């Protein structure tokens, strides 16, 4: 008897009275072989059910049930009913029968248990929301935990930590952004940042020292009209200037630019520089340069930037700075002379260090240089330093011999060279042996002793060949058998 026929007969017997339609019978049939309660396995077809019921695992579980031992529980299984095994099996006539030899069971006993099984469409795990506040409440020390523990709890319970905003550290002076406090600290302590801050401070202080054109336009007291107008305009301007001078305090910055009554109008260039209008002495200019150098920590004469006032003082007391100051003033051994054709440039251009477009002469070393850069290089050279310190000159290395040569030796050498350069007679080269002898004699180096050259030079008659034919040397003979 086949398993499929058995299931069909079981369905006809069990569902004879309650068959509302074909669709309901198909569902019941599907439920019968869709699930095995003993092994808790879902079966999808009759052939799959036949193979499962004939297997060893199913027989073993059925044997355990028949002996009264409950099989090991399976997760998600439904408790078994008391009684014989609910799985169908072949009849007694079959050759390979199942261990469960029960015949048919009533449909009322078996159907409700099968109807209680979950269908294939139901998900085994259902997601349920977990409140984040409850998870934090479970862990009272959640805020003080390690970041690894927090990450594990967040992944498990879904606790979301609000993302922290990244702190942006930037330098508005240098237009830079930093990733950490250590980077920002290193930048603020650096020389580049300090130089830019000093340059900004210098630009802020400049409008206070020198009035700009806009401020001159805004303040009628500082604006001076040229003296080419009518007399009525001049009187009005003088009245305005007197009124403003009486209203402004004497200690204000703008008071130094006001004109006194009865003075002639000055050009705008004289008003723009307060140091010139107050005192034209060179001492005040030098003081202002020192003050600027202290503010900016920069020596405009030597073009050297320093980081502190102590470094600036050490530089000012150094020999290089003093030498440059002496070169500018012309008081030391280095004298400065104006370069030809550069007077117009000096008048039109800015002052600077006062050493532009000049030539310099070092009297100690007797050296002329053409620019300020060359002067600095010469001052820092070893030659100038040794001369200033009074050290003797070091001899320069030369590959040539510096022995003093006597005039007699030089005269003898010149006479011998002249004799060798004279044209020889044609009989001199009459034979190859004589030519070889002459060439070998000419190639000999002259002896250094002066005793050979005290007499007259060797006459050319001594170099002539002797009387009679001279036999030439025979050529070598090679023996070749083939």
From Swiss-Prot:
Q: Where is the composition biased (Basic and acidic residues)?
A: 231-240
Region of interest: Disordered: 54-75, 189-259, 268-287, 331-352, 378-397
GO cellular component annotations of the record: nucleus
Could you give a single Gene Ontology term from the biological process aspect?
A: intrinsic apoptotic signaling pathway by p53 class mediator
**Location of this chain's protein in the cell:** Nucleus
Positions of transmembrane segments: none
Where is the region Required for induction of apoptosis? 1-105
Statement: the UniProt record of this protein carries the keyword Zinc-finger: yes
ZnF regions (Matrin-type) run across 34-64, 169-199, 294-328, 360-390
Q: Which UniProt keywords apply?
A: Apoptosis, Metal-binding, Nucleus, Repeat, Zinc, Zinc-finger
Chief location of this protein?
Answer: nucleus
Under the GO molecular function aspect, what terms does this record hold? nucleic acid binding; zinc ion binding
The reply on keyword Zinc-finger is yes
- InterPro entries this protein is in? Matrin/U1-like-C_Znf_C2H2, Znf385, Znf_C2H2_sf, Znf_C2H2_type
Tell me the segments the record calls region Interaction with p53/TP53: 106-482
What is known about what this protein does?
May play a role in p53/TP53-mediated apoptosis.
Describe its assembly. Answer: Interacts with p53/TP53; the interaction is direct.
This chain's protein is named Zinc finger protein 385B
Mind giving the lineage of the organism this protein is from? Eukaryota, Metazoa, Chordata, Craniata, Vertebrata
């Amino acid at each position: 008897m086949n398993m499929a026929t058995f299931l069909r007969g079981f369905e006809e017997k069990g569902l004879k009275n309650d068959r509302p339609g074909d669709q309901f019978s198909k569902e019941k049939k599907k439920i019968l072989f869709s699930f095995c309660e003993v092994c808790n396995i879902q079966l999808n077809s009759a052939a799959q059910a036949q193979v499962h019921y004939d297997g060893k695992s199913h027989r073993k579980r059925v044997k355990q049930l028949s002996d009264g031992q409950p099989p090991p529980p399976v997760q998600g299984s439904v408790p078994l009913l008391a009684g014989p095994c609910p799985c169908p099996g072949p009849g007694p006539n079959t050759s390979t029968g199942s261990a469960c030899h029960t015949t048919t069971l009533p449909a009322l006993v078996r159907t409700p248990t099968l109807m209680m099984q979950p269908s294939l469409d139901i998900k085994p795990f259902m997601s349920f929301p977990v409140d984040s506040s409850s998870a934090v409440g479970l862990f009272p020390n959640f805020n003080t935990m390690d970041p690894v523990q927090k990450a594990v709890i967040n992944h498990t319970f879904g606790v979301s930590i609000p993302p922290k905003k990244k702190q942006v550290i930037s330098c508005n002076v240098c237009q830079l952004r930093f990733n950490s406090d250590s980077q920002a600290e290193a930048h603020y302590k650096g020389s580049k940042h300090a130089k830019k801050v000093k340059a900004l401070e210098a630009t802020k202080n400049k409008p206070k020292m020198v009035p700009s054109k806009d401020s001159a336009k805004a303040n009628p007291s500082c604006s001076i009209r040229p003296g080419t107008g009518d007399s009525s305009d001049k009187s009005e301007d003088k009245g305005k200037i007197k009124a403003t001078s009486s209203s402004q305090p004497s200690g204000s910055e703008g008071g130094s630019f006001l004109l006194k009554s009865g003075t002639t109008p000055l050009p705008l260039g004289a008003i723009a520089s307060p140091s010139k209008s107050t005192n034209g002495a060179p001492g005040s200019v030098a003081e202002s340069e020192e003050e600027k150098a202290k503010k900016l920590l920069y020596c405009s004469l030597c073009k050297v930037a320093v980081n502190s006032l102590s470094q600036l003082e050490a530089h000012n007391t150094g020999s290089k700075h003093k030498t440059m100051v002496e070169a500018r003033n012309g008081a030391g051994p280095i004298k400065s002379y104006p370069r030809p054709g550069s007077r117009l440039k000096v008048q039109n251009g800015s002052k600077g260090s006062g050493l532009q477009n000049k030539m310099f002469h070092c009297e100690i070393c007797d050296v002329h240089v053409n620019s300020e850069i060359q002067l600095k290089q010469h001052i820092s050279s070893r030659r100038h330093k040794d001369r200033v310190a009074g050290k003797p000159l070091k001899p320069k290395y030369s590959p040539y011999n510096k022995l003093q040569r006597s005039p007699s030796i030089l005269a003898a050498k010149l006479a011998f060279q002249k004799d060798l350069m004279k044209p020889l007679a044609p009989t001199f080269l009459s034979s190859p042996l004589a030519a070889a002898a002459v060439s070998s004699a000419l190639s000999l180096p002259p002896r250094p002793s002066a005793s050979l050259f005290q007499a007259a030079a060797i006459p050319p008659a001594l170099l002539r060949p002797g009387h009679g034919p001279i036999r030439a040397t025979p050529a070598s003979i090679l023996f070749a058998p083939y």
